[in-house]
């Protein structure tokens, strides 16, 4: 199984390392022709406005949207969550707009306000997940069929909608592989 990782910006190498630790091949995606044959796609963190513009410039936005609408599992972390959201508060930036979610960018503050916290994520089991938040967004509101999987201070920080998964935090920056494993189970 090959999982694509959008390699425009952010911790794409760390996502690939997490996939490889689970015995799955992760491949860097920079052009639309590289999407062929992947079983899923990860959109890493970074700066969502920049990633969105690069996806337009490199002709990736529409092909990724088309594949996801056709059922390709897509997992967005931090900026990837912003790009998956239908609504981004105060922004008209390019986005995939696939998830019934309204997102606030950089909601927990600036880079200096980054933090780590143990989250209760029932779909991952009883043990808390140590989450790393860096200039993180949160989801202010969702509509069905989107479903909240984790919250922090009453803000949604992990959500699933069918073949789409998104986290406000960076699971690739920890040794805990449960979020990546959950995504792989979504793929089947």
From Swiss-Prot:
One of its GO terms (molecular function) is pyridoxal 5'-phosphate synthase (glutamine hydrolysing) activity. The keyword Translocase does not apply. Pathway: Cofactor biosynthesis; pyridoxal 5'-phosphate biosynthesis. Coiled coil: none annotated. The active site is at 78 (nucleophile), 170 (charge relay system), 172 (charge relay system). L-glutamine binds at residues 46-48, 105, 134-135. The keyword DNA-binding does not apply. GO terms for biological process: glutamine catabolic process; pyridoxal phosphate biosynthetic process; pyridoxine metabolic process. Transmembrane segments: none annotated. PANTHER family: PYRIDOXAL 5'-PHOSPHATE SYNTHASE SUBUNIT SNO, PYRIDOXAL 5'-PHOSPHATE SYNTHASE SUBUNIT SNO1-RELATED. Belongs to the glutaminase PdxT/SNO family. HAMAP family: PdxT. This is Pyridoxal 5'-phosphate synthase subunit PdxT. The gene is pdxT.
């Amino acid at each position: 199984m090959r999982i694509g990782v959008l390699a425009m910006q952010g911790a794409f190498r760390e996502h690939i390392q997490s996939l490889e630790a689970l015995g799955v091949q992760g491949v860097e995606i920079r052009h639309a022709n590289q999407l062929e044959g992947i079983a899923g796609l990860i959109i890493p963190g970074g700066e969502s406005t920049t990633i969105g513009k690069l996806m337009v410039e490199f002709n990736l936005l529409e092909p990724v949207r088309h594949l996801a609408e056709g059922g390709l599992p897509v997992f967005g972390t931090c900026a990837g969550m912003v790009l998956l959201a239908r609504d981004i508060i105060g922004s008209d930036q390019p986005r995939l707009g696939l998830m019934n979610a309204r997102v606030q960018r950089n909601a927990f503050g600036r880079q200096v306000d980054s933090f780590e916290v143990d989250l209760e994520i029932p779909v991952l089991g009883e043990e808390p997940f140590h989450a790393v938040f860096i200039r993180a967004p949160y989801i202010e509101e969702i509509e069905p069929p989107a479903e909240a999987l984790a919250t922090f201070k009453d803000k949604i920080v992990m959500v699933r909608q069918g073949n789409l998964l998104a986290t406000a935090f960076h699971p690739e920056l920890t040794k805990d592989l449960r979020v990546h494993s959950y995504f792989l189970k979504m793929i089947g």
